[in-house]
Amino acid sequence: MLSPQRTRFRKQHRGRMKGISSRGNRICFGRYALQALEPAWITSRQIEAGRRAMSRNVRRGGQIWVRIFPDKPVTVRPTETRMGSGKGFPEYWVAVVKPGKILYEMGGVPENIARKAISIASSKMPIRTQFIISG
């Protein structure tokens, strides 16, 4: 699963997901892509599940590019713990995704295969997405 090798700080604020994605909203590498339509945190497990689903469907042909990276730590408190006594420990990593962000790209395969693979990957995502074609 994806996670940063080292970070400057162990814990981060939760932040807000306002507006639409201004970066990473165009197809750069492949011909087909999966684009987010809603804001969300996407975990490294979900990213990996989508990638595996796509690569299983495409077999040897074609290439897949993952355009998001989980660089935000999410902290979790132990269960049945009283309030206070600091922030919890980092439990998992998420990628902050805004509407318009490209999640995956694919190339080197026919459109019908790409559409099928990307639809399976989209079912692994916790948000609404759309299939787009470059050009």
UniProtKB/Swiss-Prot annotation:
Its main location: plastid. It comes from the Eukaryota. Signal peptide: none annotated. Belongs to the universal ribosomal protein uL16 family. Gene3D superfamilies: Ribosomal protein L10e/L16. This is Large ribosomal subunit protein uL16c. The keyword Zinc does not apply. The gene is rpl16. GO terms for biological process: mitochondrial translation. Keywords: Chloroplast, Plastid, Ribonucleoprotein, Ribosomal protein. InterPro entries: Ribosomal_uL16, Ribosomal_uL16_bact-type, Ribosomal_uL16_CS, Ribosomal_uL16_dom, Ribosomal_uL16_sf. It comes from Phaseolus vulgaris.
